[in-house]
Regions:
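Signal-peptide-cleavage-adjacent N-terminal segments of secreted and extracellular proteins
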Residues: 5, 10-114, 140-141, 150-151, ...
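Juxtamembrane membrane-interface segments at transmembrane-helix boundaries in membrane proteins
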Residues: 27-32, 57-58, 93-96, 129-141, ...
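Membrane-interfacial loop- and helix-cap regions that link adjacent transmembrane helices
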Residues: 316-317, 327-384, 407, 411-413, ...
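Polytopic endomembrane small-metabolite transporters, centered on the Drug/Metabolite Transporter
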Residues: 460-537
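Extracytoplasmic ligand/sensor domains, especially the bilobed periplasmic-binding protein
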Residues: 26-28, 32, 103, 114-249, ...
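Acidic, Ser/Thr-rich intrinsically disordered and amphipathic helical segments
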Residues: 40, 55, 71-74, 78, ...
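Extracellular/periplasmic bilobed ligand-binding domains
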Residues: 226-349, 353, 357, 390-397, ...
Length: 537
Protein backbone atom coordinates (compact mmCIF):
# COMPACT_ATOMS: atom_id res chain seq x y z
CA UNK A 1 0.00 0.00 0.00
CA UNK A 2 1.35 3.41 -0.97
CA UNK A 3 2.35 5.56 2.03
CA UNK A 4 0.66 8.93 2.42
CA UNK A 5 2.91 11.98 2.36
CA UNK A 6 2.78 14.45 5.24
CA UNK A 7 0.97 16.94 3.00
CA UNK A 8 -1.65 14.34 2.09
CA UNK A 9 -2.16 13.45 5.76
CA UNK A 10 -2.59 17.12 6.59
CA UNK A 11 -5.02 17.48 3.70
CA UNK A 12 -7.15 14.67 5.07
CA UNK A 13 -7.02 16.20 8.54
CA UNK A 14 -7.96 19.67 7.40
CA UNK A 15 -10.83 18.63 5.23
CA UNK A 16 -12.28 15.77 7.18
CA UNK A 17 -15.96 16.12 7.91
CA UNK A 18 -15.39 16.62 11.62
CA UNK A 19 -12.89 19.43 11.12
CA UNK A 20 -15.14 21.30 8.74
CA UNK A 21 -18.00 21.04 11.19
CA UNK A 22 -15.81 22.61 13.86
CA UNK A 23 -15.35 25.62 11.60
CA UNK A 24 -18.96 25.80 10.55
CA UNK A 25 -19.92 28.33 13.19
CA UNK A 26 -17.47 30.86 11.76
CA UNK A 27 -17.92 30.38 8.02
CA UNK A 28 -21.29 32.06 7.64
CA UNK A 29 -20.14 35.03 9.73
CA UNK A 30 -16.76 35.55 8.10
CA UNK A 31 -16.21 38.71 6.14
CA UNK A 32 -13.26 39.01 3.80
CA UNK A 33 -11.79 41.09 1.01
CA UNK A 34 -11.08 39.15 -2.18
CA UNK A 35 -9.64 41.01 -5.17
CA UNK A 36 -8.41 38.79 -7.97
CA UNK A 37 -5.04 39.30 -9.58
CA UNK A 38 -2.27 37.54 -11.47
CA UNK A 39 -0.59 37.11 -8.09
CA UNK A 40 -2.48 37.32 -4.81
CA UNK A 41 -1.22 38.38 -1.38
CA UNK A 42 -2.98 37.28 1.78
CA UNK A 43 -3.49 39.77 4.60
CA UNK A 44 -4.16 39.27 8.31
CA UNK A 45 -5.24 42.20 10.46
CA UNK A 46 -6.86 42.59 13.92
CA UNK A 47 -9.87 44.33 12.38
CA UNK A 48 -11.98 43.46 15.41
CA UNK A 49 -10.76 43.34 18.97
CA UNK A 50 -11.13 40.04 20.78
CA UNK A 51 -14.59 39.40 22.13
CA UNK A 52 -15.69 38.76 25.68
CA UNK A 53 -17.14 35.56 27.05
CA UNK A 54 -18.25 33.26 24.24
CA UNK A 55 -17.93 35.94 21.56
CA UNK A 56 -14.94 35.46 19.26
CA UNK A 57 -14.84 39.06 18.04
CA UNK A 58 -15.46 42.38 19.75
CA UNK A 59 -15.69 45.99 18.63
CA UNK A 60 -13.97 47.38 15.55
CA UNK A 61 -10.28 48.15 16.07
CA UNK A 62 -10.22 51.56 14.40
CA UNK A 63 -6.47 52.18 14.18
CA UNK A 64 -4.60 48.89 14.35
CA UNK A 65 -7.33 47.15 12.38
CA UNK A 66 -9.00 49.40 9.83
CA UNK A 67 -6.07 51.74 9.20
CA UNK A 68 -3.59 48.90 8.73
CA UNK A 69 -5.98 47.01 6.45
CA UNK A 70 -6.45 50.12 4.32
CA UNK A 71 -2.66 50.62 4.29
CA UNK A 72 -2.30 47.26 2.56
CA UNK A 73 -4.99 48.15 0.02
CA UNK A 74 -3.32 51.53 -0.51
CA UNK A 75 0.06 49.88 -1.14
CA UNK A 76 -1.48 47.36 -3.57
CA UNK A 77 -3.14 50.22 -5.49
CA UNK A 78 0.16 52.10 -5.72
CA UNK A 79 2.06 49.03 -6.93
CA UNK A 80 -0.57 48.22 -9.56
CA UNK A 81 -0.22 51.79 -10.90
CA UNK A 82 3.59 51.58 -10.98
CA UNK A 83 5.05 51.20 -14.47
CA UNK A 84 8.36 49.87 -13.15
CA UNK A 85 7.39 47.51 -10.32
CA UNK A 86 5.73 44.32 -11.61
CA UNK A 87 4.66 45.94 -14.91
CA UNK A 88 2.04 43.88 -16.67
CA UNK A 89 1.26 41.94 -13.50
CA UNK A 90 -1.74 42.75 -11.33
CA UNK A 91 -1.58 42.07 -7.61
CA UNK A 92 -4.74 40.89 -5.88
CA UNK A 93 -5.53 40.41 -2.20
CA UNK A 94 -7.32 38.06 0.16
CA UNK A 95 -7.65 39.86 3.50
CA UNK A 96 -9.05 38.24 6.64
CA UNK A 97 -9.78 39.33 10.21
CA UNK A 98 -7.88 37.73 13.11
CA UNK A 99 -10.18 39.21 15.78
CA UNK A 100 -6.98 39.73 17.80
CA UNK A 101 -6.89 36.01 18.71
CA UNK A 102 -4.26 33.48 17.68
CA UNK A 103 -6.67 30.53 17.53
CA UNK A 104 -9.21 32.43 15.44
CA UNK A 105 -6.43 33.66 13.14
CA UNK A 106 -5.26 30.10 12.58
CA UNK A 107 -8.74 29.02 11.53
CA UNK A 108 -8.99 31.95 9.14
CA UNK A 109 -5.57 31.20 7.65
CA UNK A 110 -6.75 27.80 6.47
CA UNK A 111 -8.25 29.74 3.56
CA UNK A 112 -4.72 30.60 2.41
CA UNK A 113 -3.54 26.99 2.34
CA UNK A 114 -6.77 25.62 0.86
CA UNK A 115 -5.74 27.10 -2.46
CA UNK A 116 -2.39 25.31 -2.29
CA UNK A 117 -4.17 22.02 -1.67
CA UNK A 118 -6.51 22.39 -4.62
CA UNK A 119 -3.60 23.32 -6.87
CA UNK A 120 -1.51 20.23 -6.07
CA UNK A 121 -2.93 18.18 -8.96
CA UNK A 122 -3.72 21.03 -11.34
CA UNK A 123 -1.87 19.26 -14.17
CA UNK A 124 -4.75 16.78 -14.33
CA UNK A 125 -7.01 19.61 -15.52
CA UNK A 126 -5.07 20.53 -18.66
CA UNK A 127 -6.96 20.95 -21.94
CA UNK A 128 -5.96 18.94 -25.05
CA UNK A 129 -4.26 22.03 -26.51
CA UNK A 130 -2.05 22.33 -23.42
CA UNK A 131 -3.86 25.28 -21.85
CA UNK A 132 -5.12 25.30 -18.27
CA UNK A 133 -8.73 24.38 -17.67
CA UNK A 134 -11.05 27.06 -16.30
CA UNK A 135 -12.01 26.06 -12.79
CA UNK A 136 -14.87 27.79 -11.01
CA UNK A 137 -15.29 28.41 -7.29
CA UNK A 138 -11.67 27.72 -6.45
CA UNK A 139 -9.79 29.67 -3.79
CA UNK A 140 -7.18 32.25 -4.75
CA UNK A 141 -3.63 30.88 -4.83
CA UNK A 142 -1.65 32.89 -2.28
CA UNK A 143 1.87 34.02 -3.21
CA UNK A 144 2.63 35.35 0.27
CA UNK A 145 0.96 36.64 3.43
CA UNK A 146 1.21 40.07 5.05
CA UNK A 147 0.68 39.73 8.82
CA UNK A 148 -0.13 39.11 11.52
CA UNK A 149 -0.07 41.89 14.00
CA UNK A 150 0.23 40.20 17.40
CA UNK A 151 3.23 37.90 17.85
CA UNK A 152 1.03 35.05 19.09
CA UNK A 153 -0.94 35.28 15.84
CA UNK A 154 2.16 35.35 13.64
CA UNK A 155 3.63 32.34 15.43
CA UNK A 156 0.50 30.22 14.95
CA UNK A 157 0.14 31.25 11.32
CA UNK A 158 3.85 30.76 10.59
CA UNK A 159 3.64 27.17 11.84
CA UNK A 160 0.88 26.54 9.29
CA UNK A 161 2.27 28.46 6.31
CA UNK A 162 5.70 26.83 6.52
CA UNK A 163 4.11 23.44 5.74
CA UNK A 164 2.99 24.87 2.42
CA UNK A 165 6.11 26.99 1.81
CA UNK A 166 4.16 30.26 1.79
CA UNK A 167 6.33 33.29 2.71
CA UNK A 168 5.04 35.59 5.44
CA UNK A 169 6.00 39.16 6.39
CA UNK A 170 4.77 40.71 9.63
CA UNK A 171 4.47 44.46 10.08
CA UNK A 172 4.17 44.44 13.89
CA UNK A 173 5.18 41.12 15.50
CA UNK A 174 8.27 41.72 17.61
CA UNK A 175 8.60 38.51 19.65
CA UNK A 176 12.19 37.26 19.80
CA UNK A 177 10.88 33.72 19.21
CA UNK A 178 10.23 34.61 15.59
CA UNK A 179 13.97 35.15 15.02
CA UNK A 180 14.49 31.36 15.21
CA UNK A 181 14.91 30.50 11.53
CA UNK A 182 15.07 26.79 12.25
CA UNK A 183 11.40 26.96 13.28
CA UNK A 184 10.07 29.97 11.38
CA UNK A 185 11.87 29.45 8.12
CA UNK A 186 9.32 31.27 5.93
CA UNK A 187 8.84 34.25 8.24
CA UNK A 188 10.22 37.78 7.88
CA UNK A 189 9.27 41.14 9.38
CA UNK A 190 9.74 44.85 8.88
CA UNK A 191 10.11 45.55 12.63
CA UNK A 192 12.94 44.65 15.03
CA UNK A 193 12.58 42.03 17.80
CA UNK A 194 11.62 42.85 21.39
CA UNK A 195 15.19 42.66 22.66
CA UNK A 196 15.77 46.31 21.81
CA UNK A 197 12.70 47.53 23.66
CA UNK A 198 13.58 45.45 26.71
CA UNK A 199 17.07 46.91 26.70
CA UNK A 200 15.77 50.48 26.37
CA UNK A 201 13.28 50.00 29.23
CA UNK A 202 16.02 48.71 31.52
CA UNK A 203 18.23 51.68 30.63
CA UNK A 204 15.42 54.12 31.41
CA UNK A 205 15.05 52.54 34.85
CA UNK A 206 18.77 52.70 35.47
CA UNK A 207 18.85 56.33 34.38
CA UNK A 208 16.31 57.28 37.05
CA UNK A 209 17.83 54.88 39.58
CA UNK A 210 14.55 52.95 39.81
CA UNK A 211 15.91 49.69 41.19
CA UNK A 212 12.74 48.18 42.70
CA UNK A 213 9.90 47.74 40.22
CA UNK A 214 6.95 45.50 39.42
CA UNK A 215 6.12 44.00 36.03
CA UNK A 216 2.92 43.01 34.23
CA UNK A 217 2.88 40.99 31.01
CA UNK A 218 0.19 39.77 28.66
CA UNK A 219 -0.04 36.01 28.53
CA UNK A 220 1.33 34.81 25.21
CA UNK A 221 4.41 35.16 23.07
CA UNK A 222 4.60 38.95 22.91
CA UNK A 223 4.22 39.68 26.60
CA UNK A 224 6.01 36.67 28.06
CA UNK A 225 9.09 36.74 25.83
CA UNK A 226 9.27 40.52 26.07
CA UNK A 227 9.16 40.62 29.86
CA UNK A 228 11.63 37.73 30.02
CA UNK A 229 14.08 39.77 27.93
CA UNK A 230 13.48 42.77 30.20
CA UNK A 231 14.14 40.71 33.34
CA UNK A 232 17.46 39.56 31.90
CA UNK A 233 18.45 43.17 31.17
CA UNK A 234 17.23 44.26 34.61
CA UNK A 235 19.41 41.69 36.39
CA UNK A 236 22.46 43.02 34.56
CA UNK A 237 21.68 46.45 36.03
CA UNK A 238 20.90 45.27 39.58
CA UNK A 239 17.21 46.10 39.21
CA UNK A 240 14.98 44.00 41.46
CA UNK A 241 11.49 42.77 40.57
CA UNK A 242 9.01 43.22 43.44
CA UNK A 243 6.23 41.19 41.84
CA UNK A 244 5.73 39.79 38.34
CA UNK A 245 2.11 39.56 37.22
CA UNK A 246 0.44 38.18 34.10
CA UNK A 247 -2.89 38.96 32.52
CA UNK A 248 -4.59 35.93 30.98
CA UNK A 249 -6.49 35.66 27.73
CA UNK A 250 -9.90 35.46 29.38
CA UNK A 251 -10.26 39.25 29.23
CA UNK A 252 -12.30 39.21 32.47
CA UNK A 253 -12.47 42.53 34.26
CA UNK A 254 -11.83 41.06 37.71
CA UNK A 255 -8.49 39.64 36.55
CA UNK A 256 -7.22 43.17 35.84
CA UNK A 257 -8.58 44.40 39.16
CA UNK A 258 -6.77 41.59 40.97
CA UNK A 259 -3.50 42.52 39.25
CA UNK A 260 -3.85 46.10 40.50
CA UNK A 261 -4.49 44.79 44.02
CA UNK A 262 -1.31 42.69 43.81
CA UNK A 263 0.69 45.72 42.66
CA UNK A 264 -0.64 47.75 45.58
CA UNK A 265 0.67 45.07 47.94
CA UNK A 266 4.18 46.31 47.08
CA UNK A 267 3.95 49.98 48.15
CA UNK A 268 7.67 50.60 47.65
CA UNK A 269 7.49 49.58 43.99
CA UNK A 270 5.81 52.62 42.47
CA UNK A 271 7.19 51.94 39.00
CA UNK A 272 5.45 49.26 36.91
CA UNK A 273 6.93 47.89 33.69
CA UNK A 274 4.36 46.74 31.13
CA UNK A 275 4.91 44.38 28.22
CA UNK A 276 1.28 44.07 27.22
CA UNK A 277 -0.99 43.98 24.21
CA UNK A 278 -2.96 47.14 23.56
CA UNK A 279 -6.31 45.74 24.73
CA UNK A 280 -4.75 44.40 27.92
CA UNK A 281 -3.03 47.75 28.55
CA UNK A 282 -6.32 49.59 28.21
CA UNK A 283 -8.09 47.26 30.65
CA UNK A 284 -5.26 47.46 33.19
CA UNK A 285 -5.23 51.28 33.14
CA UNK A 286 -9.03 51.25 33.53
CA UNK A 287 -8.63 48.93 36.53
CA UNK A 288 -6.07 51.31 38.04
CA UNK A 289 -8.57 54.13 37.56
CA UNK A 290 -11.30 52.17 39.35
CA UNK A 291 -8.94 51.60 42.26
CA UNK A 292 -7.64 55.18 42.09
CA UNK A 293 -4.14 53.65 42.07
CA UNK A 294 -1.21 55.80 41.03
CA UNK A 295 1.91 54.28 39.49
CA UNK A 296 4.60 55.39 37.09
CA UNK A 297 4.16 53.18 34.04
CA UNK A 298 7.03 52.23 31.72
CA UNK A 299 5.43 50.46 28.76
CA UNK A 300 6.38 48.78 25.50
CA UNK A 301 4.95 49.47 22.05
CA UNK A 302 1.81 47.51 22.94
CA UNK A 303 0.78 50.81 24.54
CA UNK A 304 3.03 53.12 22.56
CA UNK A 305 1.44 56.46 21.73
CA UNK A 306 -2.15 55.24 21.52
CA UNK A 307 -4.46 57.75 23.12
CA UNK A 308 -7.27 55.18 23.18
CA UNK A 309 -5.38 53.22 25.86
CA UNK A 310 -5.90 55.94 28.47
CA UNK A 311 -9.21 57.42 27.33
CA UNK A 312 -11.30 58.05 30.42
CA UNK A 313 -8.41 57.12 32.72
CA UNK A 314 -5.99 59.94 31.98
CA UNK A 315 -5.51 60.86 35.64
CA UNK A 316 -3.78 57.55 36.42
CA UNK A 317 -1.64 57.60 33.27
CA UNK A 318 0.08 60.97 33.61
CA UNK A 319 3.84 60.52 33.74
CA UNK A 320 3.78 57.22 31.85
CA UNK A 321 6.85 56.57 29.72
CA UNK A 322 6.05 54.47 26.67
CA UNK A 323 8.06 53.18 23.74
CA UNK A 324 7.05 52.97 20.11
CA UNK A 325 8.96 51.78 17.06
CA UNK A 326 10.20 54.89 15.29
CA UNK A 327 8.49 55.44 11.96
CA UNK A 328 7.76 58.14 9.44
CA UNK A 329 4.17 59.04 8.51
CA UNK A 330 3.24 58.00 4.97
CA UNK A 331 1.72 61.26 3.76
CA UNK A 332 0.17 59.75 0.65
CA UNK A 333 -1.73 57.37 2.90
CA UNK A 334 -3.16 60.33 4.83
CA UNK A 335 -4.69 61.71 1.64
CA UNK A 336 -5.97 58.27 0.67
CA UNK A 337 -7.54 57.46 4.04
CA UNK A 338 -9.14 60.88 4.45
CA UNK A 339 -10.82 60.47 1.06
CA UNK A 340 -12.69 57.34 2.17
CA UNK A 341 -16.32 57.20 3.24
CA UNK A 342 -19.06 54.53 3.28
CA UNK A 343 -20.33 55.71 -0.10
CA UNK A 344 -17.09 55.23 -2.03
CA UNK A 345 -15.41 52.42 -0.10
CA UNK A 346 -17.32 49.31 -1.07
CA UNK A 347 -14.40 46.87 -1.13
CA UNK A 348 -13.93 46.97 2.65
CA UNK A 349 -16.86 45.11 4.28
CA UNK A 350 -15.87 46.39 7.75
CA UNK A 351 -15.80 50.06 6.81
CA UNK A 352 -19.46 50.78 7.51
CA UNK A 353 -19.11 49.36 11.03
CA UNK A 354 -15.97 51.45 11.50
CA UNK A 355 -17.80 54.58 10.35
CA UNK A 356 -20.76 54.04 12.68
CA UNK A 357 -18.47 53.36 15.62
CA UNK A 358 -16.18 56.31 14.94
CA UNK A 359 -18.95 58.88 14.51
CA UNK A 360 -21.46 57.24 16.91
CA UNK A 361 -24.23 57.21 14.33
CA UNK A 362 -26.19 54.80 12.16
CA UNK A 363 -26.03 54.46 8.38
CA UNK A 364 -29.53 52.99 8.57
CA UNK A 365 -32.61 54.62 10.03
CA UNK A 366 -31.85 55.14 13.74
CA UNK A 367 -30.56 51.64 14.32
CA UNK A 368 -29.63 50.94 17.96
CA UNK A 369 -31.22 54.27 18.92
CA UNK A 370 -28.40 56.18 17.26
CA UNK A 371 -28.81 59.27 15.14
CA UNK A 372 -28.59 58.81 11.39
CA UNK A 373 -25.12 59.57 10.03
CA UNK A 374 -24.82 62.97 8.38
CA UNK A 375 -23.72 62.51 4.77
CA UNK A 376 -21.24 65.36 5.21
CA UNK A 377 -19.25 63.53 7.88
CA UNK A 378 -15.62 63.09 6.88
CA UNK A 379 -12.29 61.84 8.14
CA UNK A 380 -10.01 64.84 8.57
CA UNK A 381 -7.18 66.17 10.72
CA UNK A 382 -9.59 66.89 13.58
CA UNK A 383 -10.54 63.23 14.06
CA UNK A 384 -7.70 61.29 12.45
CA UNK A 385 -4.05 60.58 13.18
CA UNK A 386 -2.01 58.06 11.24
CA UNK A 387 -1.43 54.85 13.20
CA UNK A 388 2.20 54.34 14.18
CA UNK A 389 2.88 51.17 12.16
CA UNK A 390 1.37 52.18 8.81
CA UNK A 391 4.88 52.60 7.40
CA UNK A 392 5.74 49.01 8.37
CA UNK A 393 2.58 47.66 6.67
CA UNK A 394 3.38 49.53 3.45
CA UNK A 395 7.01 48.39 3.57
CA UNK A 396 5.90 44.77 4.06
CA UNK A 397 3.67 44.87 0.96
CA UNK A 398 6.40 46.53 -1.09
CA UNK A 399 8.97 43.99 0.12
CA UNK A 400 6.81 41.15 -1.19
CA UNK A 401 6.22 43.01 -4.46
CA UNK A 402 9.95 43.65 -5.00
CA UNK A 403 10.72 39.98 -4.36
CA UNK A 404 8.04 38.88 -6.85
CA UNK A 405 9.32 41.45 -9.34
CA UNK A 406 12.87 40.07 -9.20
CA UNK A 407 11.60 36.51 -9.43
CA UNK A 408 9.46 37.38 -12.45
CA UNK A 409 12.38 39.07 -14.21
CA UNK A 410 14.55 36.00 -13.61
CA UNK A 411 12.03 33.30 -14.53
CA UNK A 412 10.19 35.21 -17.27
CA UNK A 413 12.97 37.26 -18.96
CA UNK A 414 11.21 37.74 -22.29
CA UNK A 415 7.84 39.03 -21.10
CA UNK A 416 6.30 41.40 -18.58
CA UNK A 417 3.44 38.94 -18.10
CA UNK A 418 3.49 35.87 -15.91
CA UNK A 419 5.05 32.90 -17.66
CA UNK A 420 4.30 29.26 -16.88
CA UNK A 421 7.29 29.10 -14.52
CA UNK A 422 5.51 31.47 -12.13
CA UNK A 423 1.94 30.25 -12.40
CA UNK A 424 2.55 27.82 -9.56
CA UNK A 425 4.94 29.70 -7.30
CA UNK A 426 7.88 28.02 -5.64
CA UNK A 427 7.51 29.60 -2.20
CA UNK A 428 10.84 28.27 -1.00
CA UNK A 429 12.65 29.89 -3.90
CA UNK A 430 10.69 33.13 -3.51
CA UNK A 431 11.59 33.39 0.18
CA UNK A 432 15.25 32.34 0.15
CA UNK A 433 16.45 33.56 -3.23
CA UNK A 434 14.49 36.80 -3.51
CA UNK A 435 12.66 37.98 -0.40
CA UNK A 436 15.64 37.74 1.94
CA UNK A 437 17.80 39.51 -0.63
CA UNK A 438 15.53 42.45 -1.46
CA UNK A 439 16.96 45.93 -1.20
CA UNK A 440 14.77 48.97 -1.75
CA UNK A 441 13.86 52.42 -0.49
CA UNK A 442 10.80 52.15 1.72
CA UNK A 443 7.84 54.40 2.49
CA UNK A 444 10.02 56.38 4.90
CA UNK A 445 12.73 56.96 2.24
CA UNK A 446 14.95 54.66 4.27
CA UNK A 447 16.78 51.50 3.36
CA UNK A 448 14.78 48.25 3.75
CA UNK A 449 16.60 44.94 4.00
CA UNK A 450 14.63 42.15 5.67
CA UNK A 451 17.71 40.13 6.54
CA UNK A 452 18.88 42.84 8.92
CA UNK A 453 15.80 44.28 10.68
CA UNK A 454 18.13 45.31 13.52
CA UNK A 455 19.07 48.26 11.33
CA UNK A 456 15.54 49.51 11.87
CA UNK A 457 15.88 49.70 15.64
CA UNK A 458 14.79 53.29 16.20
CA UNK A 459 12.52 53.71 19.21
CA UNK A 460 10.30 56.67 19.97
CA UNK A 461 10.08 57.59 23.65
CA UNK A 462 6.77 59.16 24.69
CA UNK A 463 5.73 60.88 27.89
CA UNK A 464 2.07 61.11 28.87
CA UNK A 465 1.63 64.78 29.82
CA UNK A 466 -1.21 66.68 31.44
CA UNK A 467 -3.09 69.59 29.91
CA UNK A 468 -2.15 69.15 26.24
CA UNK A 469 -4.48 68.41 23.34
CA UNK A 470 -2.55 65.25 22.58
CA UNK A 471 -1.61 63.50 25.84
CA UNK A 472 1.54 62.02 24.33
CA UNK A 473 4.53 63.93 23.07
CA UNK A 474 5.36 63.24 19.42
CA UNK A 475 8.95 62.39 18.44
CA UNK A 476 10.58 63.96 15.42
CA UNK A 477 12.86 62.07 13.04
CA UNK A 478 16.34 61.54 14.41
CA UNK A 479 19.50 61.19 12.38
CA UNK A 480 17.75 59.70 9.37
CA UNK A 481 20.40 57.45 7.91
CA UNK A 482 20.98 54.56 5.57
CA UNK A 483 23.85 53.28 7.69
CA UNK A 484 23.86 51.02 10.72
CA UNK A 485 22.76 52.76 13.94
CA UNK A 486 26.16 52.40 15.60
CA UNK A 487 27.49 54.82 12.97
CA UNK A 488 24.95 57.49 13.89
CA UNK A 489 26.22 60.41 15.94
CA UNK A 490 23.81 62.77 17.70
CA UNK A 491 24.10 64.82 20.86
CA UNK A 492 22.21 64.20 24.08
CA UNK A 493 20.28 67.12 25.51
CA UNK A 494 20.21 65.99 29.13
CA UNK A 495 18.65 69.17 30.49
CA UNK A 496 15.67 68.77 28.23
CA UNK A 497 15.25 65.04 28.93
CA UNK A 498 15.18 65.71 32.66
CA UNK A 499 12.79 68.64 32.31
CA UNK A 500 10.35 66.56 30.27
CA UNK A 501 10.53 63.29 32.18
CA UNK A 502 11.09 64.47 35.74
CA UNK A 503 8.40 67.13 35.56
CA UNK A 504 5.77 64.46 35.05
CA UNK A 505 7.38 61.40 36.61
CA UNK A 506 8.53 62.96 39.88
CA UNK A 507 5.11 64.55 40.30
CA UNK A 508 3.84 61.02 40.96
CA UNK A 509 5.97 60.72 44.09
CA UNK A 510 8.86 58.86 42.45
CA UNK A 511 12.27 60.11 43.52
CA UNK A 512 14.96 60.66 40.93
CA UNK A 513 18.51 60.19 42.10
CA UNK A 514 21.59 60.29 39.93
CA UNK A 515 22.04 60.37 36.17
CA UNK A 516 24.30 57.54 35.02
CA UNK A 517 25.02 57.64 31.33
CA UNK A 518 22.85 55.37 29.21
CA UNK A 519 25.61 53.37 27.57
CA UNK A 520 23.41 51.62 25.01
CA UNK A 521 21.46 54.68 23.90
CA UNK A 522 23.60 56.56 21.46
CA UNK A 523 21.53 59.23 19.78
CA UNK A 524 18.78 61.65 20.58
CA UNK A 525 17.16 64.67 19.07
CA UNK A 526 14.83 66.90 21.04
CA UNK A 527 11.95 69.08 19.90
CA UNK A 528 9.72 70.62 22.59
CA UNK A 529 8.51 67.65 24.62
CA UNK A 530 9.70 64.95 22.25
CA UNK A 531 12.62 62.60 22.51
CA UNK A 532 13.64 59.98 19.96
CA UNK A 533 16.32 57.45 20.83
CA UNK A 534 18.16 54.84 18.82
CA UNK A 535 19.59 51.73 20.38
CA UNK A 536 23.14 50.58 19.95
CA UNK A 537 22.58 47.47 17.85
Amino acid sequence: MKMLTRLQVLTLALFSKGFLLSLGDHNFLRREIKIEGDLVLGGLFPINEKGTGTEECGRINEDRGIQRLEAMLFAIDEINKDDYLLPGVKLGVHILDTCSRDTYALEQSLEFVRASLTKVDEAEYMCPDGSYAIQENIPLLIAGVIGGSYSSVSIQVANLLRLFQIPQISYASTSAKLSDKSRYDYFARTVPPDFYQAKAMAEILRFFNWTYVSTVASEGDYGETGIEAFEQEARLRNICIATAEKVGRSNIRKSYDSVIRELLQKPNARVVVLFMRSDDSRELIAAASRANASFTWVASDGWGAQESIIKGSEHVAYGAITLELASQPVRQFDRYFQSLNPYNNHRNPWFRDFWEQKFQCSLQNKRNHRRVCDKHLAIDSSNYEQESKIMFVVNAVYAMAHALHKMQRTLCPNTTKLCDAMRILDGKKLYRDYLLKINFTGADDNHVHLCQPEWLCGLGLFVCTQGSHHPFSTPEECCHTQTAPQQVQCQWNWDHILSVLCKHVCANGVQWAGSPRLHHLISVIVNCSSVLVFLDC
